[in-house]
């Protein structure tokens, strides 16, 4: 019985590998996918009737927002979601993680990471080609007739909540809030969603489930995709404060430290150090400017975007070579100086952006900040975040902890 847990873990990892290999084998045979059908005759008949997806050979520009949790990625996602010619998807890789990685391993092992990244790259490649049927491999329970109510945060995508994908009662110009979308639109028809995707010139996807830009090299180098990466970073101290408030149970020991002034002996410091290590590795790659990232990579600090959202958004769109939509500018004006009471929801994007970027300084004790600074010293210097050398410096809003840096895109 002593080794029973090891046997369970090995069986789980073997199961993951088998699932992923099966999906890879299936999709390698054809770009035309009809997942989830066990009746051979029925599968052939439906495949003949369904739409055939071909890889995008045009020079459309597609976008990947590479971020980590609580770094401002939902805000950046909205800069693309509001564009009328962009098909935006919010965290589709959630489904890969939820399907392939056993909850009890938490996806921390190297084997888990390899499986997750391989499957993620395959799904991203398909989604950029508007092959939304491929997503069905990871939706549980499987969609019926390509319809489902299980797409993660479907309401965070404007296109998936408007005509022709959704036909809500009322005005055709009605813009649904996320909760209203799920309630009023009913099941998501992936065939209609794929059609809406193909009608637009660009696909933008946000993910917090790819650790480093190196993990995307195969996609960046694929000339059929013309993919550009926006890497969003934030002061790790701010990320820690935001996660502690949002994920109260997971970050309970950090909150206990804040409340008692004593560091718990069993504190999971990797909740902080993993962010810093991934940032450092990924940003180091980007700043070394390898040839495969030329014209493909832009580093954006959340703090710069929060302080001057319109200017930074214009820079982002200029890098991408996509005209800035007036709807995006209007959204920025309405959502970066908002009523603070509207931004209390943990996933809200309505807020005073400049104030939000600095709020962490009043939500962490100085001993926690000092610990974080010691653990993340390298990446803080790399990204231009200043050390707070005392409680007084930390709490004084007149003292900026963000250096003026000009992270120009690699063109």
From Swiss-Prot:
User: Null mutant: what phenotype?
Assistant: Mutant mice are born at the expected Mendelian rate and have normal developmental and reproductive potential.
Which Gene3D superfamilies does this entry report, sorted A to Z?
A: P-loop containing nucleotide triphosphate hydrolases (3.40.50.300)
List glycan-bearing residues. 56, 145, 189, 334
Recorded catalytic activity of this chain's protein = 3'-phosphoadenylyl sulfate + keratan = adenosine 3',5'-bisphosphate + keratan 6'-sulfate
Please report, in chain numbering, the residue ranges of the motif Cell attachment site: 337-339
What membrane topology is annotated for this entry? Single-pass type II membrane protein
Annotated GO biological processes are: galactose metabolic process; inflammatory response; keratan sulfate proteoglycan biosynthetic process; sulfur compound metabolic process
UniProt note on tissues of expression: Broadly expressed with highest levels in central nervous system. Expressed in cortex (at protein level). Expressed in high endothelial venules in peripheral lymph nodes, mesenteric lymph nodes and Peyer's patches.
In Gene Ontology terms, what is one molecular function of this protein? keratan sulfotransferase activity
The record places the following residue ranges in the Lumenal compartment, namely: 24-411
Q: Which residues lie on this side of the membrane: Cytoplasmic?
A: 1-2
The EC number(s) given in the record are 2.8.2.21
Name its cellular compartments.
Answer: Golgi apparatus membrane
Binding site residues for 3'-phosphoadenylyl sulfate = 69-75, 234-242
Q: Which GO terms describe its cellular component?
A: Golgi membrane
The pathway this protein participates in, as annotated, is: Glycan metabolism
Q: Which residues cross the membrane?
A: 3-23
Keywords assigned by UniProt, alphabetized = Carbohydrate metabolism, Glycoprotein, Golgi apparatus, Inflammatory response, Membrane, Signal-anchor, Transferase, Transmembrane, Transmembrane helix
Q: Which family does it belong to?
A: Belongs to the sulfotransferase 1 family. Gal/GlcNAc/GalNAc subfamily.
> In UniProt terms, what function does this protein have?
Sulfotransferase that utilizes 3'-phospho-5'-adenylyl sulfate (PAPS) as sulfonate donor to catalyze the transfer of sulfate to position 6 of internal galactose (Gal) residues of keratan. Cooperates with B4GALT4 and B3GNT7 glycosyltransferases and CHST6 sulfotransferase to construct and elongate disulfated disaccharide unit [->3(6-sulfoGalbeta)1->4(6-sulfoGlcNAcbeta)1->] within keratan sulfate polymer. Has a preference for sulfating keratan sulfate, but it also transfers sulfate to the unsulfated polymer.
Q: What is this protein's name? A: Carbohydrate sulfotransferase 1
Organism this protein belongs to: Mus musculus (Mouse)
Q: What is the lineage of its organism?
A: Eukaryota, Metazoa, Chordata, Craniata, Vertebrata
């Amino acid at each position: 019985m002593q080794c029973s847990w090891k046997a369970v873990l090995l069986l789980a990892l073997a199961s993951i590998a088998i699932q992923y290999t099966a999906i890879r084998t299936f999709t390698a045979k054809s770009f035309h996918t009809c997942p989830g059908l066990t009746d051979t005759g029925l599968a052939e008949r439906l495949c003949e009737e369904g739409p055939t997806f071909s890889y995008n050979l045009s020079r459309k520009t597609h976008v990947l927002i590479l971020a980590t949790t609580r770094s401002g990625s939902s805000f950046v996602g909205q800069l693309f979601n509001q564009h009328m010619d962009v098909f935006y998807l919010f965290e589709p890789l959630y489904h890969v993680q939820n399907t392939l990685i056993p909850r009890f391993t938490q996806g921390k092992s190297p084997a888990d990471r390899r499986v997750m990244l391989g499957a993620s790259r395959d799904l991203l490649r398909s989604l950029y080609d508007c092959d939304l049927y491929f997503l069905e491999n990871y939706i549980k329970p499987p969609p019926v007739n390509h319809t489902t109510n299980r797409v993660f945060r479907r309401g965070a995508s404007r296109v998936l909540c408007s005509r022709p994908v959704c036909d809500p009662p009322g005005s055709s110009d009605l813009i649904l809030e996320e909760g209203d979308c799920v309630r009023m639109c009913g099941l998501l028809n992936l065939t209609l969603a794929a059609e809406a995707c193909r009608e637009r010139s660009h696909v933008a996807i946000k993910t917090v489930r790819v650790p480093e830009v190196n993990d995307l090299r195969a996609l960046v180098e694929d000339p059929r995709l013309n993919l550009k990466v926006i890497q969003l970073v934030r002061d790790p101290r701010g990320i820690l404060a935001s996660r502690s408030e949002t994920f109260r149970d997971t970050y309970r020991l950090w909150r206990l430290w804040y409340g008692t002034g004593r560091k718990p002996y069993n504190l999971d410091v990797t909740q902080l150090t993993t962010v810093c290590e991934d940032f450092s590795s990924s940003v180091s790659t980007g700043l070394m400017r390898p040839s495969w990232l030329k014209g493909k990579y832009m580093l954006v600090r959340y703090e710069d975007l929060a302080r001057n959202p319109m200017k930074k958004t214009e820079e982002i769109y200029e890098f991408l070579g996509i005209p800035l939509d007036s709807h995006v500018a209007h959204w920025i004006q309405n959502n970066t100086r908002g009523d603070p009471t509207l931004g209390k929801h943990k996933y809200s994007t309505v807020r005073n952006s400049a104030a939000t970027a600095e709020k962490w300084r009043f939500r962490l004790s100085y001993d926690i900040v000092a610990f974080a600074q010691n653990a993340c010293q390298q990446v803080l210097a790399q990204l231009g975040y200043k050390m707070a050398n005392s409680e007084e410096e930390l709490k004084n809003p007149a003292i900026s902890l963000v250096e003026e840096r000009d992270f120009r895109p690699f063109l």
